Amino acid sequence: MFWWYYRSPARVVDPSNPWPIILWLQGGPGGSGVGFGNFAEIGPLDLNLKPRNLTWLIKADLLFVDSPVGTGFSYVDDENLLVTTDEESATDLTTLLKAIFNGNETLQKSPLFIVAESYGGKFAATLGVSALNAIEAGELKLQLGGVALGDSWISPEDFVFSWGPLLKDVSRFDNNGLSGANSLAQQIQRQIQEGKYVDATNTWGELENFVLDNSNEVDFYNFLLDSSQESTDPEVNQVPKRLLLEVYSKFISSKMFPSKGASSTPDLGTLMNGPIRQKLKIIPSNVTWDGLKGYLESSRTPLYCGQDDPITKGFFRSYKNLFFYWILGAGHFVPVDQPCVSLQMVGSITRSPNTNSTF
């Protein structure tokens, strides 16, 4: 497995508030964390290899991995070793963490936060359980600080049923569009319940085409835009096509299809009710958690970007080991659309000793 580790220039040694490490997991499946997450979103250099002003390296060390194997520069000599499930991917990642952390006492002192985007959230939830089990068994020497899921594909049924009402609310759909989208979502739900994950994935593709045809091609990465419009960063508009589509290895479209339609909510339940102090960014209603009532009754806190900026950038709500963030004015790639407030968010999640927005 190919990985890239950045040690932050801002790293400080403080036993009472240890410096965090972020493991970034990209989506897809098949998106390169080393390529996309690193250069297009949060790494120290942008796509033009210019310094990124609001890199997450300000708040934590960064560890990017091309996962699962077959993605980016990660490969196998025997195609029979390519993973076919999220659990197998988590096993590979846990093995990698053992190789990186078990022999490095310095890294062992830093809490590891698994931060994921899109389909990476399914990997993150499963990896969180796998890593926790390895830690408790004495096989993995690291501190698991938390798991953060960003707009993650963890419950396909919930997401596809949300598309129609959302697009109707923002006037991208009329009643006919809403009805058609809901009909396809119901078909996906039936196929998932019957274990027909490949069929469900194909119907999901039909739903995407339906959305494009009936919304005048809304941007799937940001419903505030047309698909032809550029993202906040013009370069990023083309990156998903280059890194998330064209470089898919052949196993992505065949061997991982069953996992794409499956839910990760059992793994979330294990994490939420586990003994570790982790901070998930989303909890579906069907995940059992003994703090849910208190969380729902707590108030939201507004987020701003700097003391002198009066514009509301989002909200967050927290209770016990759950932190939930709403980021305004952002699409699927939050660090790109709202880099300032996302940097504040990740600093809070990881309890970074660096309270500044610079090195």
Language model features by range: what are they?
Residues M1-F359:
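Terminal and linker regions of secretory-pathway proteins
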